[in-house]
A protein has these predicted regions:
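Surface-exposed cleft-lining segments at the edges of enzyme active sites
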Residues: 101-121, 125, 158-182
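C-terminal capping/extension of enzyme domains
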Residues: 1-38, 172-189, 206-280
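Short, solvent-exposed loop/turn segments at secondary-structure junctions
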Residues: 68-72, 157-161, 205-209, 252-257
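A contiguous catalytic/ligand-binding core that recognizes phosphate-bearing ligands
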Residues: 130, 134-147
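Proline-aspartate-enriched helix->loop->beta-strand connector
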Residues: 188-204
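Structural motif
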Residues: 64, 201, 247-249
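Short, contiguous, well-structured surface segments enriched in hydrophobic/aromatic residues
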Residues: 144-166
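Active-site and ligand/interface coordination hotspots across diverse enzymes
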Residues: 1-121, 184-191, 237, 278-280
Length: 280
């Protein structure tokens, strides 16, 4: 750990944000053969995490892992995701003082309360999880409260694009040797150890092979209780935190071929509950 932010700014975080992310993006775009709207952009600093990792209650929160962050053409996005982190990173590199990163990290921790939140996306996550597992917090539709109190989010690829067009198999192969992705995985593992989530939930089929390889030791099990490919899931456990943590992988909520209807989303969570009751 480093500096005055003992619980927040880990060596893993500093290693990730200290990289030449423009060079990393150029290399990963080439390796994954990304083009058009799927290209990762080289001018936005990497997405590390959002959610208040200092206030999460161990065993009463969920780590959501997405595919890669959405590039939003909006002044709010530019202020929060480009101008703020670049200002903080410049000051940190010039001074060597980790306190220079505090405004950026504090914004990340308060992301779910901010005007810059990708509300369309995160409402779906909150409404998928909240009513069933955090009903006292979620109430009628307190989606922000559910996120703030119970969710931390990271992405398997920390770089932004207009569309997620990442090939699952190519990504898993790249994760075996790419220095930026290995550094990012170390950060994800640090987040898992810190918040000790009730479970880890992967949102998007493009992350299944990589997560199975890197967190499940290649032992993920596919379940299709409903006979509906949209609600098919993969399940398993990870031991990276020193504890045995369940992992749910489902297709992208709201995406092509994913669990898009309320029926399919309930099928996803019903299958998860059934498996979890016998494998917790």
């Amino acid at each position: 750990m480093s500096g005055g932010f003992y619980l927040v700014i880990s060596d893993e975080f500093l290693a990730m944000v200290g990289r030449d992310y423009s060079a990393d993006v150029a290399r990963i775009n080439l390796e994954l053969n990304l083009k058009g709207d799927g290209l990762l952009v080289d001018y936005v600093p990497p997405h590390t995490f959002v959610g208040n990792i200092d206030k999460m209650e161990n065993g009463n929160c969920i780590l959501v892992i997405g595919i890669n962050p959405f590039l939003w053409d909006d002044q709010r996005f530019e202020r929060a995701n480009i101008e703020l982190p670049n200002h903080c990173l410049t000051n940190y590199r010039n001074s060597g003082d980790v306190n220079a990163l505090s405004d950026w990290i504090n914004w990340q921790k308060e992301y779910f309360l901010s005007n810059e939140i990708n509300a369309t996306h995160f409402k779906k996550i909150s409404r998928l999880i909240g009513p069933r597992y955090f009903s006292l917090t979620h109430g009628d539709d307190n989606w922000r409260d559910t996120l703030c109190q119970h969710i931390v989010e990271v992405d398997i690829v920390p770089y932004y694009s207009i569309k997620a067009q990442i090939n699952d198999h190519k990504l898993a192969k790249l994760y075996r040797h790419d220095s930026a992705l290995i550094t990012h995985l170390n950060l994800i593992k640090w987040v898992i150890k810190k918040i000790q989530p009730r479970w880890i939930q992967v949102n998007g089929k493009a992350g299944w092979e990589t997560i199975c390889q890197e967190l499940l030791n290649g032992e993920g099990k596919i379940i299709d209780d409903a006979g509906d490919k949209g609600s098919e899931i993969m399940v398993g456990h990870t031991n990276v935190s020193g504890n045995r943590i369940p992992v749910l992988l489902h297709k992208f909520i709201g995406g092509l071929g994913g669990a898009n209807s309320h029926i399919q989303r309930n099928q996803v969570m019903d299958s998860w509950d059934k498996w979890l009751s016998n494998n917790s």
